[in-house]
Curated annotation (Swiss-Prot):
It comes from Bos taurus (Bovine). It is found in: Cytoplasm. Belongs to the TCP-1 chaperonin family. The gene is CCT6B. InterPro entries: Chap_CCT_zeta, Chaperone_TCP-1, Chaperonin_TCP-1_CS, Cpn60/GroEL/TCP-1, GroEL-like_apical_dom_sf, GROEL-like_equatorial_sf, TCP-1-like_intermed_sf, TCP-1_chaperonin. This is T-complex protein 1 subunit zeta-2.
Length: 531
């Protein structure tokens, strides 16, 4: 009897073989759910929430976040896979598949009496060798636009259909190249992803500027301003109550009138300073003037600004204030005391767009914008959500490629190369640990196998062809998913991120090893004592 039973008679316990069987069963169950998602030919999953919301996706990260996984081991694997997505933006499905396959291959040897610790040692040796091979396979490239397009397309085609992937690829690459600055880290928060429920998903486009999800609040203000100066400010243009509890006392109606006028004058002076700046910079030209304020603007102030031909937007979101300065230039001001031309940004075109009851303000034609907007369009909510998830992964794929300074061949080529190298390397290892290396090599081949299977080809036949071609050509060979034939991934422009593969090898080995070495599962928390 398990020792825990003596302490707590209601505890549940699984030991030795039973514990391993439970864990391997959970890993393979999760693998079976996700295996049909892998690659550009993967199938969709429909997630229906408790409230009846429908989500169509084949993004492993979304699935693992949304699914309610109750099994503790499956939940652990899901957390590792979603952490991979948070760090590198890709490789979620591959992570689950490889962990499941490592445990499956290990199970074959354990059932023949091999101790899990020996397999774990073999896995560790294989991982170190696999990382060495990955270093040799990676291709250092000058990061030109064509390489970025190939990397983004490879990532996006696994998330959305090919026609949409082609549209998104151009937009995603141009947005990262626009915000990229030499010798600075790339900040993807400077790419605003704005959704608009309108037209079809292929109308998604890149705006070299900013889109705000609100419009002007005064009927007389211009709907379109060409060649505009932009003043971004965080100044209250309405009367605000004091922060401390205070009051004004008056004896007569005249005194009250004076107080009201003093309050009004306080705001009018601020507005007048903005109007004076507009008159100063636009006096000799037809240039427009736009004020974007983070705080409120009262109706009187709006009226005064409208009379002088100024387009004013109030209550802009805080995150957009930083983006405005980067997109249009200029400086966001917190006071109207020292306004000058240097504070102003510039945009070639500012216009308001009305869609149903929603209003949007487009700020376009900025010179060298360091912040841009991806305007995602789609007919319904779940299409928009799917595109946004894909765009985020595409952005991170390009960022990874730029930061790594290298790429690795995709389409299952890397896994085939590493597996071949491990089979050769196995003969140099003494003792039974070589079986762990063999198991690791066989497990990695799950990626090309599933890619072939999801594309409707015979997985064994396709894999044999690819391995034969690799042996003959000595180049990384992947699978052409349109024909099922081997192809040189580099020539076809199918590239994966180096950091994704590196992270994949590390995390899969660690988790698979940890799960293998579990020999007892106990459920003995306080909740199981009730009743």
């Amino acid at each position: 009897m398990a020792a825990i039973k003596a302490i707590n008679s209601k505890a549940e316990v699984a030991r030795a073989q039973a514990a391993l069987a439970v864990n391997i069963c959970a890993a393979r169950g999760l693998q079976d759910v996700l295996r049909t998602n892998l690659g550009p030919k993967g199938t969709m999953k429909m997630l229906v929430s408790g409230a009846g919301d429908v989500k169509l996706t084949k993004d492993g990260n979304v699935l693992l976040h949304e699914m309610q996984i109750q099994h503790p081991t499956a939940s652990l694997i899901a957390k590792v896979a979603t952490a991979q997505d948070d760090i590198t933006g890709d490789g979620t499905t591959s992570n689950v598949l490889i962990i499941g396959e490592l445990l499956k291959q290990a199970d074959l040897y354990i059932s023949e009496g091999l101790h899990p610790r020996i397999i774990a040692e073999g896995f560790e040796i294989a991982k170190i060798k696999a990382l060495e091979v990955l270093e040799q396979v990676k291709i250092k490239k000058e990061m030109k636009r064509e390489i970025h397009l190939d990397v983004a397309r490879t990532s996006l085609q696994t998330k959305v259909h090919p026609q949409l992937a082609d549209v998104l690829t151009e937009a995603v690459v141009d947005s990262v190249l626009a915000i990229r600055r030499p010798n600075y880290p790339i900040d993807l928060f400077m790419v605003e992803i704005m959704e608009m429920k309108h037209k079809s998903e292929t109308d998604t486009k890149l705006i070299k500027g900013l889109v705000l999800d609100h419009g002007a609040r005064h009927p007389d203000m211009k709907k379109r301003v060409d060649d505009a100066f932009i003043l971004t400010c965080n100044v209250s243009l309405e009367y605000e109550k004091t922060e401390v509890s205070s009051g004004f006392f008056y004896k007569t109606a005249e005194e009250k009138e004076k107080l009201v006028k003093a309050e009004r004058k306080f705001i009018e002076d601020r507005v007048q300073k903005i109007i004076d700046l507009k008159d100063k910079v636009c006096a000799q030209s037809n240039k427009g003037f736009v004020v974007i304020n983070q705080k409120g603007i009262d109706p009187f102030s709006l009226d005064a600004l409208a009379k002088h031909g100024i387009l004013a937007l109030r209550r802009a979101k805080r995150r957009n204030m930083e983006r405005l300065s980067l997109a249009c230039g200029g400086v966001a001001v917190n006071s109207v005391e020292d306004l000058s031309v240097d504070c102003l940004g510039h945009a070639g075109l500012v216009y308001e767009y009305t869609l149903g009851e929603e209003k949007y303000t487009f700020i376009e034609d900025c010179i060298n914008p360091r912040s841009v907007t991806l305007l995602v369009k789609g007919p319904n909510k779940h299409t928009l959500t799917q595109i946004k998830d894909a765009v985020r992964d595409g952005l991170r794929a390009i960022k990874n490629a730029i930061e790594d300074g290298c790429v690795v061949p995709g389409a299952g080529a890397v896994e085939v190369v590493i597996a071949e190298a491990l089979v050769t390397y196995k003969h140099t290892i003494q003792g039974r640990a070589r079986l762990g290396v063999q198991a690791f090599a066989d497990a990695l081949l799950i990626i090309p196998k599933v890619l072939a299977q999801n594309s409707g080809y015979d997985l064994q036949e396709t894999l044999v062809k690819v391995q034969a071609e690799h042996s003959n050509s000595k180049q990384p060979v992947g699978i052409d998913l349109n024909t099922g034939e081997p192809m040189v991934a580099a020539d076809a422009g199918v590239w994966d991120n180096y950091c994704v593969k590196k992270q994949l090898l590390h995390s899969c080995t660690v988790i698979a090893t940890n799960i293998l070495l579990v020999d007892e599962i106990m459920r003995a928390g306080m909740s199981s004592l009730k009743g």
